[in-house]
Amino acid sequence: MCHQWLVLSWFSLVLLASPLMAIWELEKDVYVVELDWYPDAPGEMVVLTCNTPEEEGITWTSAQSNEVLGSGKTLTIQVKEFGDAGWYTCHKGGEVLSHSHLLLHKKEDGIWSTDILKDQKESKNKTFLKCEAKNYSGRFTCWWLTAISTDLKFSVKSSRGSSDPRGVTCGAATLSAERVSVDDREYKKYTVECQEGSACPAAEESLPIEIVVDAVHKLKYENYTSGFFIRDIIKPDPPKNLQLKPLKNSRQVEVSWEYPETWSTPHSYFSLTFSIQVQGKNKKERKDRLFMDETSATVTCHKDGQIRVQARDRYYSSSWSEWASVSCS
């Protein structure tokens, strides 16, 4: 949130907020007005200033009304509800001089609204953003869910502490083809790829990465934040190249696998541990899992069963990979 008066030079559009400083610039010509949301709330007074050195012949209109709202270089409006938000335009002699788009950020009982994204409910605290990294390269993926289909826009920014010179760059949020069902309702999934510019995979992390998602739906603005260390969001790809070797005169087989290609190297330093599980024919019959650091194991595998292997960082209890499997047949 802005902590000083927002004053642009005479050739640009200027918005001045009330002393509560409840207005700030999201992007060029787009401003967020922060409102306490309760019955009979007074709202916020906003002053719009046109981008012309002239003082006469200026009129104001809004997208909500074609009527002239006022005249002169400035227009003062009281913003109390969504009907007061949207586009405001100043004109002179039929010429458009500048635009301003006002969005509202609601606060009810001291809590900012979180209506746009779906709470993924994976902890005691609300979880709107989830992030994963396949290795320690500094590259990670974040995603979120929403039931909204239209008039929706996201922007993402990230950093690793204000005092850390290493920047984090995020691409544009994209709509995934995957649809996620939660409580019998289908949600759309958005993802974003981020990369820490000067990541050092072997270095100890002292500052968390912070990610902020700005979400806009129609005239509503919300933001969502998450903070984490890369080590906490590590989830390797599944082991690759699973192979079975029958053992002579035995019902046992030797199953072997390799580290996933995307895992950090050298493997002698970035080591994985593995979990092995044998499934029966109906896939519901499962024997106890075996845990080991080697890339092979001897197990009993019956016809029509399968062997599953997954991986996790050996030295830090982050997430297990998805399973890789091979048929016993």
UniProtKB/Swiss-Prot annotation:
One of its GO terms (biological process) is interleukin-12-mediated signaling pathway. Gene3D superfamilies: Immunoglobulins. Residues 238-329 form the Fibronectin type-III domain. Residues 1-22 form the signal peptide. CDD domains: FN3. GO terms for molecular function: cytokine activity; cytokine receptor activity; interleukin-12 alpha subunit binding; interleukin-12 receptor binding. InterPro entries: FN3_dom, FN3_sf, Hematopoietin_rcpt_L_F3_CS, Ig-like_dom, Ig-like_dom_sf, Ig-like_fold, Ig_sub2, IL-12. The keyword Lyase does not apply. It is found in: Secreted. Keywords: Cytokine, Disulfide bond, Glycoprotein, Immunoglobulin domain, Secreted, Signal. SMART domains: IGc2 (SM00408). Residues 29-106 form the Ig-like C2-type domain. SUPFAM superfamilies: Fibronectin type III (SSF49265), Immunoglobulin (SSF48726). Pfam families: IL12p40_C (PF10420). Glycans are attached at N125, N135, N223. GO terms for cellular component: interleukin-12 complex; membrane. It comes from the Eukaryota. Disulfide bonds join C50-C90. PROSITE patterns: FN3, HEMATOPO_REC_L_F3, IG_LIKE. Belongs to the IL-12B family. Heterodimer with IL12A; disulfide-linked. The heterodimer is known as interleukin IL-12. Heterodimer with IL23A; disulfide-linked. The heterodimer is known as interleukin IL-23. Also secreted as a monomer. Interacts with NBR1; this interaction promotes IL-12 secretion. PANTHER family: INTERLEUKIN-12 SUBUNIT BETA, INTERLEUKIN-12 SUBUNIT BETA-RELATED. This is Interleukin-12 subunit beta. It comes from Equus caballus (Horse).
